[in-house]
Amino acid sequence: MARKAHSERTKSSLLLLLSIVMLGVGLNFLGRLLNLLLGLPLYLDNVGTLLVSMAGGLVPCITVGFFSNLINGVNDPNSTYYAVISILIAAAAVICKKKRVLQRFPAMLLAVLIFALLGGLLGGVLTWLINGKSFGEGYTVDLAVKIADALSLDYISSNLLACFLVDVADKLAVTVPSVLLFLLLPKKLLDLFRAQSWYLQKKYEGR
């Protein structure tokens, strides 16, 4: 009887984990789709990752970041290479949540800068390597040309700075709505997540 009850709890916990991961991946996909429809020079594909990092902790948010890039890789194979960046952003988001950086303004801006350093600078270096020591083309590269002219920077420095600036705008655009969504979640739902074995931080953290 006890074994059956344990099995049911495990099954329920895994279903809950699957649900929160699917929600996060879905939000990331919707953000990416919205960005494409609006024609913005951003990404908007981290709302789900950040929301899940605050609500569900490290395991589900890393899973969300990884599978979001894996799914995007179906249409854009290069997206899979950025999975490591998404995982780093997810881990950083969990730390920022634990330190209550995400939930307070203007402290939230520090989190945005951290995410942009990971997504913009590290992501920029990864782009440079993937494209054979080239940053490719597009809005960010055009911005880099203007930065190079204005500040007399070399090709790599101007492009990395452009990547960082664009990513600051992107991470601000996804951090604000993800925090607002988190604040709207019922306390009972958050308590349910925090009672699961995959929620590694057991100490109650409040919002």
Predicted regions and their residues:
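Membrane-embedded alpha-helical hairpins and interfacial helices in multi-pass inner-membrane proteins
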Residues: 32-40, 80-81, 103-207
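Alpha-helical transmembrane segments and their helix-entry boundary regions
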Residues: 50, 61-65, 79-83, 108, ...
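Membrane-interface helix-boundary motifs at transmembrane edges
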Residues: 8-10, 96-107
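Hydrophobic transmembrane alpha-helices
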Residues: 2-55, 59-70, 75
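Alpha-helical transmembrane segments in multi-pass membrane proteins
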Residues: 20-27, 53, 61-64, 68, ...
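Extended, non-catalytic scaffold segments that flank or surround catalytic motifs
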Residues: 65-72, 94-99, 199-207
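Juxtamembrane membrane-interface segments at transmembrane alpha-helix termini
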Residues: 56-60, 74-81, 96-101, 120-124
